[in-house]
Amino acid sequence: MSDGDYDYLIKFLALGDSGVGKTSVLYQYTDGKFNSKFITTVGIDFREKRVVYRANGPDGTVGRGQRIHLQLWDTAGQERFRSLTTAFFRDAMGFLLLFDLTNEQSFLNVRNWISQLQMHAYCENPDIVLCGNKSDLEDQRAVKEEEARELAEKYGIPYFETSAANGTNISQAIEMLLDLIMKRMERCVDKSWIPEGVVRSNGHTSTDQLSEEKEKGLCGC
């Protein structure tokens, strides 16, 4: 896809404590590489990737491909940047929430991050995918998979164990998040929840596009 040749521009936000591997995960997704020497993110950074999204119909058939320009925003996890980070919550449509499988405190802080999202995101029930990162460091694991899955089930969100080092489940986690977002847009009658930054390449907002489609149900917020 060339510049501007897409159907939707969608922003995702990666968040979690400092050092959980947000930058490395996004870099692995966009570039297919692992860099162990990344310095701690200061403020906000982002990466981009073009993908084609195809929804499965109720009969199992694959729908028309939607060309998606993903902006993947990388946030600082340090407390001193928290006010800057939360300012970006409302403009994002989906959230990749990471913790470090070798750091129990980063897992315990997941509840705090979800509380922040419930307060500052576009609605109280935003689309979130939880990722336990650094699954390749099994001998250093401090968080049991059962614990993480139980927490994810409590909040009704998907859970993946990922590795930026070898790429395990990173594409699957982001594709799951995109699928949740696209399905939410399809079923919403009230389009006011959609952040203004979600635009079509022809200059129309996603709200303009969706208002032309058949209304299928209420928004899940």
From Swiss-Prot:
Write the record's keywords in alphabetical order, separated by commas: Acetylation, Disulfide bond, Endosome, Exocytosis, GTP-binding, Hydrolase, Lipoprotein, Lysosome, Membrane, Methylation, Nucleotide-binding, Phosphoprotein, Prenylation
One example of the protein's molecular function in GO is:
GTPase activity
Which residues participate in GTP binding?
A: 16-24, 74-78, 133-136, 163-165
Query: Which GO biological process entries does UniProt record here?
Result: antigen processing and presentation; blood coagulation; complement-dependent cytotoxicity; cytotoxic T cell degranulation; exocytosis; exosomal secretion; melanocyte differentiation; melanosome localization
- Which top-level group of life is the source organism from? Eukaryota
Enzyme type, top EC level? hydrolase
* Record GO cellular component, one term: late endosome
Localization (cell): Membrane; Melanosome; Late endosome; Lysosome
The observed outcome of changing residue 133 to H is: Increased rates of GTP binding and GDP dissociation
The family classification in the record reads: Belongs to the small GTPase superfamily. Rab family.
Protein name in UniProt: Ras-related protein Rab-27A
Q: Which organism is it from?
A: Rattus norvegicus
